[in-house]
Amino acid sequence: MHFDHPELDRRTLLRAGLGAAAVAVVGSELVRPAAAHAAPGADLDWIISCDEWAARPPADPLSVSAIPTNKIIVHHMAFPNVTDYSEEHAKQLARDCQDLHMDGNGWSDTGQHFTVSRGGHVLEGRHGSLDRLRAGDRQMIAAHCPGENGRAIGIENEGTYVTETPPEELLDSLARLCTTICRQYGLHAHDIFGHWDFRATLCPGAMFYREFPALRRAVFKQLGTKLGDVPARRWPDIWRFVGGPVVQVAQRLLTFRGYTVPVTGVFDAATVAAVQDWQARNGVPVDIDATLTAPTWETLAPELDQKSSGIPVAAAQFMLASKGYAEVTETGEYDHATRTAVKDLQRLHGLPPNGKISTTTWCALVGGVVRQSFHKH
């Protein structure tokens, strides 16, 4: 499988950051009935289990989440881009990763649920992840993205993809794994996100992230989803447990709307209060965790064009720069570099490249998924 994507015409990019972050637990051990959407007896023999790659036992008891799984978060490992594509190398990779997470980070076990090697081998990460995938109803609480560890399946991909694209073998297997996860947990192709959508990190890498629209299309096709079943916009559901550039964009937009909040990317108490107040004032259901729901985003983000300026333009420029558009600077003016970057982003997501930031373009810009990205390319 070859992932179709627009050719690059740029980039000076920064070095890679680590793909896994400190653990934050969401959810607890609460037994629930198996989900009706799971496929009992699904063939998962192609996934190399912890026993098969000779994993160490966990250092502490592991927990199963009590809240529903609602997304997949894709990472790069920030490991070398090796040319050894063998299964033996993949097993050693899994052992090395577990050693790093347990001995270096002090975690109980491997942080992510699954690992994909550059050779396309798929391995179980955290103990119990394969059993939970087979059941399809309750995931293991992981350590791959603070704030999302109890509701997001984490997939680490071998390599560093700030300036390089993952090999086809990896992309093919990642699409297969994501498709299987979606089938078992009742998810969709539009539920696939990147680590930096919920955390301040360079993971999964700008070049890998450009492959995400094509990755989602591949999963969409394998699932046999109808275009009409895809929401017009699937926004990143940031909430008070996460942080990073997307949170900072929300803070900038809240500032534009008149709120006094620190623009730090930290989802602090002032941000929680501002989000909930905005929701109440705009007829949006107030979320107890200050989740930026679709109506919250869509009332908060103003449409922008070349006549626009100020805080929202600077917010868009900040987001573009954080995604690797190095030629974009925060001027607050809707300049040529900004329009050029917006057009490139629009083409990547199947949108008309008009250089204007509509509600739909805002969604794609902050890490969301738009229906147009699933059209035939």
Where are these regions (language model features)?
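C-terminal region of N-terminal signal peptides and the immediate post-cleavage residues
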Residues: 25-42
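Surface-exposed patches in mature extracellular/periplasmic domains of secreted proteins
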Residues: 104-113, 184-196, 262-264, 287-288, ...
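Active-site acidic/histidine clusters and adjacent loop/turn architecture
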Residues: 67-106
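A generic structural signal for short coil/turn motifs at secondary-structure boundaries
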Residues: 81-86, 162-167, 202, 262-263, ...
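Basic/polar, cationic surfaces and motifs that engage anionic cell-wall
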Residues: 2-9, 37-77, 117-136, 141-252, ...
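Cell-envelope/glycan interface and biosynthesis
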Residues: 94-105, 111-128, 152
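N-terminal secretory signal peptides and thylakoid transit peptides that target proteins
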Residues: 1-24
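Short acidic, glycine/serine/threonine-rich helix-capping segments at coil-helix boundaries
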Residues: 237-298, 305-368, 375-376
